Amino acid sequence: MIRRREFRVPSSDGKSGLHTVLWEPDGEVRQLLLISHGMTEHILRYDPFARFLAEQGIAVIGHDHLGHGGTVQNGRYGYFADKAGHVCVIRDLHRTASRIRVMYPGRPLYMLGHSMG
C-alpha cells in the first residue's frame, strides 16, 4: 500500500509554507524523485503517476510552488515574489530535495520538471 503524506516545508521567501506531498512505497525505497510542476499546475495533479512510481519502490516528493495549489496566498495565483521570484523557486526545490535526502540517505535522487518546473 502506498502512503501519501502532506506537510509544509518553509519557503525561502521567509513567509510561506510550501504545500508538500510525499508518496512512499510500502516496501524498500530504492530511489527518490522530486517532481517540479509547471505553471498553473499543482503537485496533486501528479498523484496517479507518483502512486505508480511508489509501487515500483520510488519515493516521490513535490511541492506546490509559490502562487500555486495549496501554497497560494491571498488569491495571488502564479505570483512568486516582488523581486527574483525565480530564485525562490530554485531555493525551494533545494529545500524539498534536502528534506527527502535526510529521510532516505544514500538513495539516488532524480528530478522531473514539466514546463516551468
PLM feature spans:
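Alpha/beta-hydrolase fold active-site loops
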Residues: 30-33, 108
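Conserved Rossmann-like nucleotide-binding pocket used by diverse enzymes
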Residues: 35, 61, 112
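Short N-terminal helix/helix-N-cap motif within the alpha/beta-hydrolase-1
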Residues: 43-44, 70
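Alpha/beta-hydrolase fold nucleophile elbow
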Residues: 104-115
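N-terminal cap/lid segment of alpha/beta-hydrolase-fold proteins
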Residues: 1-27
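Active-site glycine-rich loops that stabilize anionic/oxyanionic intermediates
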Residues: 37-41
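Conserved alpha/beta-hydrolase
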Residues: 50-76
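Alpha/beta-hydrolase active-site loop
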Residues: 81-102
